[in-house]
């Protein structure tokens, strides 16, 4: 008789003395990879591109570098601000600072405007209309790395501070006196990298502590609380150099944001997989005296669900490879590799640790068989204690589910549907600067510029055209729009004089959704000019660039990725469920319930973020991030519980199979859900809004799955469908006596 593959796996990893071999292999591989390959943190790209080269704004940027080159370098914008108006001493300070920068340039300084020689009266004319703000640039070499730039900015701060009594960089904006902020591309870049580097350490420490505390509270065993963390640690010891190797060879690209979220996913999902096996192991320890036999049975019983859950997440997250938006695409491989290795760790090194510690791993609540308890009581000359039945709440829940399935379905759908109804009201933003803390120096400087200077002049739209040698009324056409403030006279290309660039200042905030919506109007109006002039293929003679155009492309590409990835991911997970459960009906309602849970989480997240935390909008990337994680991880819990119902149905009638499935998986899935939600909630403590928003929405979604979808909605639907829940599998043809189900 052919043995089950999971039975063979159990014999392999949970045989006598194999635990030491398994542990030795893991230690050897971890040490070998750690000392021979780079760690993933050393291969992160500080400023990876998100838009593809085919995007119109990126084509415009490439053309501008060729035809309208700016050899000055990367700009740092030094913002000088004093409420009530800049004073003579402030302009004198600016002159002195630039005089010193001219005499002793910063290491990577490339170009410096001559502010040291410009009279105060002339300088003051370039200040904001209210006289409170003045912006001076310092240009740096484009090849300069972030670390070197950070040192240069520190040197600049020291120069300014050496000429004043009180540090103007640390003075709060609302306080009296001179304020200086470093903004622009260089200031934002250095602040962002510093922010993410601080977030990495904070995130790791907070996640480890949270998981440890939750495990101790839930299982009341110090050893059991540490084991999942050890397993995750070993998994990370292989994941980090593996990803570092792939990134070092240019096969993948990784960024700080992806690594931060991967850390959370690893601890959350990894701990869940460990708990699935540990809970089964504990059950079998109550029946089997041999820890080896108990663990082999546990691996056979839970291994399929763990493998299926990990495979669902791996393939689900792998669909992000289809994304054109860089931030999405960079998530795919690191996350899939991390979960794949974590799944292997849960079924190999975790059993090794469980065998090494044996029953002691559950100390002080050690699980023993009845005969072992009797023997222990005899030796201690005590009466055998009759253990109270655990899981009373799960039993009541199971009873309610099978007795009142329609009531539960209507109530849960009403709650989830009510939350989902807020999704159409969500406002989105694609301005990444809004994702950073309001008190981040470069953002404060940027806010000062936008508040005291024309918003449109801050980031003009660059309209570039190939006139084909014709006189075209493009400027006049662009000036007709009410949302256009000014249009500068065109500049001619350096190499091709027929190429012209118009700088268009918008009347509204160039980073707003309203401004993004004007880009197609500008494009259509210029194409009309081409058409009227008899120039064919107008779309090939026109490029629109600048920050507003880049954000417009971001919006378009993000929406394209959602339209492609969501149906592909649903199809892949549906196929996996069909293969695993052999039921078309179950596949459909499991997918539908998780998708409903996603929309509910998005609606609930908006309620909390907008009305509770005052966020005017959420980042446009959040829906796809949340969908991919919630659908993949949400199916984990469904798979674990439904596989238990399917197993029970082989020996029990339908209602008992569902009821016992809820009871048997209740505590472990609740524990796993709390831990996973907790780890994502840790993201909410970070100063980076895109991570805060993602963490909150995902944590809410996990909680909805844990406490509503998994224990109530899914089993209630299974009860109502009866044997059709298994159709067309063999279980759908299994006969049973009819049992009454109350509506």
Swiss-Prot record:
Q: Give the UniProt keywords, A-Z.
A: Cell membrane, Membrane, Transmembrane, Transmembrane helix, Transport
Top-level taxon of the source organism: Bacteria
Where does the chain cross the membrane? 20-40, 199-219, 223-243, 258-278, 303-323, 337-357, 406-426, 561-581, 584-604, 613-633, 672-692, 694-714
* Subcellular locations according to the entry: Cell membrane
The membrane topology noted for this protein in its Swiss-Prot or TrEMBL record is:
Multi-pass membrane protein
Does the keyword field hold Transport?
A: yes
A GO cellular component entry from the record: plasma membrane
* SUPFAM superfamilies, A to Z: Multidrug efflux transporter AcrB transmembrane domain
Knockout mutant characteristics: Deletion of the gene abrogates export of intact petrobactin, which accumulates inside the cell. However, growth of the mutants in iron-depleted medium is not affected, and virulence in mice is not attenuated.
Protein family according to the UniProt entry = Belongs to the resistance-nodulation-cell division (RND) (TC 2.A.6) family. MmpL subfamily.
In terms of PANTHER family, this protein maps to: MEMBRANE PROTEIN MJ1562-RELATED, MEMBRANE PROTEIN YDGH-RELATED
Q: What does this protein do?
A: Exports the siderophore petrobactin.
The name on file for this protein is Apo-petrobactin exporter
């Amino acid at each position: 008789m052919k043995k089950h593959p999971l039975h063979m796996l159990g014999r392999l990893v949970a045989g006598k003395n194999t635990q030491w071999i398994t542990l030795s292999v893991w230690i050897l591989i971890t040490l070998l990879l750690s000392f021979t390959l780079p760690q993933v943190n050393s291969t992160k790209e500080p400023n990876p591109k998100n838009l593809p080269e085919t995007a119109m704004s990126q084509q415009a940027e490439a053309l501008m570098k060729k035809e309208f080159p700016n050899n000055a370098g990367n700009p740092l914008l030094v913002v000088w601000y004093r409420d009530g108006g800049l004073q003579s001493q402030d302009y004198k300070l600016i002159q002195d600072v630039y005089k010193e920068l001219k005499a002793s340039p910063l290491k990577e300084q490339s170009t410096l405007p001559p502010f040291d020689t410009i009279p105060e009266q002339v300088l003051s004319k370039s200040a904001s209309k209210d006289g409170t703000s003045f912006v001076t640039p310092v240009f740096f070499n484009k090849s300069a790395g972030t670390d070197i730039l950070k040192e240069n900015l520190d040197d600049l701060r020291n120069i300014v501070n050496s000429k004043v009594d009180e540090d103007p960089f640390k003075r709060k904006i609302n306080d009296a006196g001179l304020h200086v902020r470093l903004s622009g591309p260089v200031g934002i870049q250095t602040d962002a990298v510093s922010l993410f580097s601080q977030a990495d350490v904070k995130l790791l420490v907070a996640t480890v502590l949270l998981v440890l505390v939750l495990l101790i509270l839930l299982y009341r065993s110090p050893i059991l609380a540490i084991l999942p963390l050890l397993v995750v640690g070993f998994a990370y010891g292989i994941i980090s150099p593996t990803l570092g190797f792939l990134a070092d060879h240019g096969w993948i690209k990784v960024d700080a944001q992806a690594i931060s979220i991967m850390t959370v996913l690893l601890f959350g999902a990894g701990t869940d997989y460990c708990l699935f096996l540990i809970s089964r192991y504990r059950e079998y320890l109550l029946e089997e005296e041999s820890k080896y036999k108990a663990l082999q049975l546990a691996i056979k019983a839970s291994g399929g669900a763990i493998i299926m859950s990990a495979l669902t997440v791996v393939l689900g997250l792998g669909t992000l490879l289809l994304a054109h938006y860089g931030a999405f695409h960079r998530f795919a491989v690191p996350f899939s590799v991390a979960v794949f290795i974590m799944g292997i760790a849960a079924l190999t090194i975790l059993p090794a640790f469980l065998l090494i510690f044996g029953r002691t791993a559950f100390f002080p609540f050690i699980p023993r068989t009845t005969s072992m308890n009797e023997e222990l009581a005899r030796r201690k000359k005590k009466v055998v204690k009759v253990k109270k039945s655990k899981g009373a709440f799960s039993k009541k829940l199971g009873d309610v589910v099978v007795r009142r399935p329609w009531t539960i379905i209507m109530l849960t759908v009403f709650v989830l549907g009510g939350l989902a109804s807020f999704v159409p009201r969500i406002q989105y933003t694609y301005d990444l600067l809004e994702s950073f803390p309001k008190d981040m120096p470069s953002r404060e400087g940027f806010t000062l510029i936008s508040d005291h200077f024309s918003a449109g002049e801050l980031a003009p739209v660059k309209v570039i055209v190939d006139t084909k040698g014709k006189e075209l009324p493009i400027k006049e056409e662009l000036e007709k729009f009410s949302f256009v403030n000014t249009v500068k006279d065109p500049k001619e290309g350096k190499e091709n004089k027929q190429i012209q660039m118009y700088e268009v200042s918008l009347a509204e905030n160039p980073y707003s959704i309203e401004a993004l919506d004007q880009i197609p109007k500008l494009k259509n109006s210029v194409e009309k000019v081409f058409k009227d002039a008899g120039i064919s293929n107008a779309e090939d003679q026109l490029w629109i660039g600048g920050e507003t155009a880049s954000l417009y492309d971001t919006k378009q590409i993000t929406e394209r990725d959602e339209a492609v990835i969501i149906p592909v991911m649903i199809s892949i997970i549906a196929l996996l469920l069909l293969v695993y459960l052999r039921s078309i009906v179950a596949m459909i309602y499991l997918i539908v319930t998780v998708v409903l849970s996603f929309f509910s989480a998005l609606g609930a997240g908006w309620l909390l973020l907008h009305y509770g935390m005052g966020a005017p909008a959420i980042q446009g990337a959040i829906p796809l991030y949340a969908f991919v994680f919630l659908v993949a991880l949400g199916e984990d819990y469904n798979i674990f519980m439904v596989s238990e119902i399917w197993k029970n149905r082989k020996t029990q009638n339908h209602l008992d199979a569902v009821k016992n499935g809820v009871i048997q998986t209740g505590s472990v899935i609740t524990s796993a859900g709390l831990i996973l939600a907790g780890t994502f909630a840790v993201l909410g403590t970070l100063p980076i809004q895109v991570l805060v928003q993602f963490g909150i929405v995902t944590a809410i979604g996990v909680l909805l799955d844990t406490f509503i979808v998994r224990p109530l909605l899914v089993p209630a639907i299974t009860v109502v469908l009866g044997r059709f829940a298994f159709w067309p599998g063999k279980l759908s043809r299994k006969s049973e006596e009819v049992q009454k189900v109350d509506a």
